[in-house]
From Swiss-Prot:
G2 motif: annotated span: 272-280
Protein name (database record): Guanine nucleotide-binding protein subunit alpha homolog
UniProt-recorded Gene Ontology molecular function terms: D5 dopamine receptor binding; G protein activity; G-protein beta/gamma-subunit complex binding; GTP binding; GTPase activity; GTPase regulator activity; metal ion binding
A GO term from the CC aspect: plasma membrane
Origin species: Drosophila melanogaster (Fruit fly)
Length: 457
């Protein structure tokens, strides 16, 4: 055995001492340099591994079946590599199989590459998911959730593409037409007289205006009568009594800007986009990286019919909840039932969220929104919060007193000390500077509270 050298395996029968042969199953294209070696060395190596001792019994061990059925079994059981080569021989009563892998087909290389890429992607996604911050935007309808989300796009430099700008343009035109139609209807129901003669024809024309699929030429045709109506004292008086009916807060902004909106080259500005109103239906997500951490904002509709969809977003991946309240709506009722106070509705929803065991350990950030509109109402001598909340003890025309009253009303719903701390901010969602300052504070709070979970250094 000591003098036997295995230099090349071919399909030819190769004679070795003791009439043992190497046969079958080995192709001619095997590189002789790759497979060069001494059979004695291979067998001695195996004896060392299994703890066998050399001796007469070992010396008589047969080496027949050097290429045996073991190769075929291995080929059938696990090998999909058509160019793999197997060399098997018997030593110490055991079958030793050597697998020599010479090359792979292009298909196999492509499969292995794809598999590695998938593994890398999954690992990266797993790492990103662990690090992401997921924020739920909750609150009653028209509380400013979608406006806050628009601000996140603007603040973080995510541009509105052309198709989206066209969509906002159409929504803005609809806001103007429907807003004027609501004011015309309210003027009649409230028995408010026209401020000047000759407005009946303009009113008639406005009521017949089509809101859907408005383009610039059509809106330019509608703009003159709408502008004349908005200048009428009767329509202005109806708008001042808007708490008595349902109308969007932004109608006055667009009616004041109607001449600019009715130009041939009109493109919505950021301010226009922030003021336009379209009810959110379903669930909408927006992701932006903040300090290399993915912040995922989830916006869901706040109307009663949409709140059943909130539960889809309640899972263990939620980092914080931002709850928005329209603080100026203490004198308004819901559009859904025309009797429930809007501020009370928001407080009841907040109560449900804060005391829900699902959110134990999750920070809750309360945005008392629409501070600008609250200031207008509080400073108006014709409005008094005590008409709606008789137990209010402060100055009804002090913005600070009214804000503190509303804040305590919401903070008082917390029934368990085990609930996470509630943070609060007074906000104006249409004010980019205000939201930027507030979000920086919120961001720092969230990152600090979740330092370990986010694996930051």
């Amino acid at each position: 055995m000591s003098g036997i050298t295995l230099t090349k395996l071919t399909q030819e029968r190769i004679s070795i001492p003791n009439n043992n042969v190497i046969t079958n199953g080995v192709e001619n294209n095997i590189d002789s340099d790759t497979l060069s070696g001494t059979l004695t060395h291979l067998m001695e190596e195996h004896r060392t591994r299994v703890g066998a001792v050399t001796g007469p019994e070992a010396a008589t061990t047969s080496t027949d079946g050097l290429i045996s059925n073991g190769a075929e079994r291995l080929r059938l059981q696990g090998s999909r590599l058509q160019t793999s080569r197997f060399a098997c021989f018997r030593c110490c009563g055991n079958i030793i199989t050597y697998l020599v892998r010479l090359r792979s087909t292009p298909e196999e290389l492509e499969q292995r590459y794809k598999s590695k890429e998938i593994d890398k992607f999954l690992e990266k996604e797993k790492h990103t998911f662990r690090r992401q911050v997921k924020l739920l935007l909750l609150g009653a309808g028209e509380s400013g959730k979608s406006t806050f989300l628009k601000q996140m796009r603007i603040i973080h430099g995510v541009n509105f593409d052309y198709e989206l700008l066209l969509e906002y343009q159409s929504v803005i035109y609809q806001n103007v037409i429907r807003g004027m139609q609501v004011l015309l209807d309210a003027r009649e129901k409230l028995n408010i007289a026209w401020g000047s003669d000759g407005r009946e024809q303009d009113a008639y024309d406005a009521k017949l205006m089509e809101c859907n699929s408005l383009d610039v030429p059509k809106f330019m045709e509608y703009a003159p009568p709408i502008s004349r109506l908005w200048q009428d004292r009767g329509i202005r008086r109806a708008f001042e009594r808007r708490r008595e009916f349902q109308i969007s807060d932004s109608v006055s902004y667009f009616l004041d800007e109607i001449q600019r909106l009715a130009t041939p080259d009109y493109v919505p500005t950021h301010k226009d986009i922030l003021h336009c109103r379209k009810a959110t239906k379903g669930v909408y997500e927006f992701c932006v990286k903040v300090q290399n951490i993915p912040f995922v904002f989830v916006d869901v509709g706040g109307q009663r019919t949409q709140r059943q969809k909130w539960t889809r977003c309640f899972d263990s991946s939620v980092t914080s909840i931002i709850f928005l309240v329209s603080s100026s709506e203490f004198d308004q009722v819901l559009a859904e039932d025309r009797k429930t106070n809007r501020l009370e509705e928001s407080k009841n929803i907040f109560d449900t969220i804060v005391n829900n065991a699902t959110f134990k350990g999750i920070s809750i950030i309360l945005f008392l929104n629409k501070t600008d509109l609250l200031e207008q109402k509080v400073c108006n001598p014709e409005t008094d919060i005590r008409w709606y909340y008789p137990h209010f003890n402060g100055n009804p025309h002090s913005v600070l007193d009214v804000q503190n009253f509303i804040l305590q009303m919401f903070m008082s719903v917390r029934r368990s000390s085990s609930i996470s701390r509630i943070y609060h901010h007074f906000t104006t969602a249409i004010d980019t500077r205000n939201i930027n300052v507030v979000f920086n504070s919120v961001k720092d709070t969230i990152l600090q509270r979740n330092l370990n979970a986010l694996m930051l250094q």
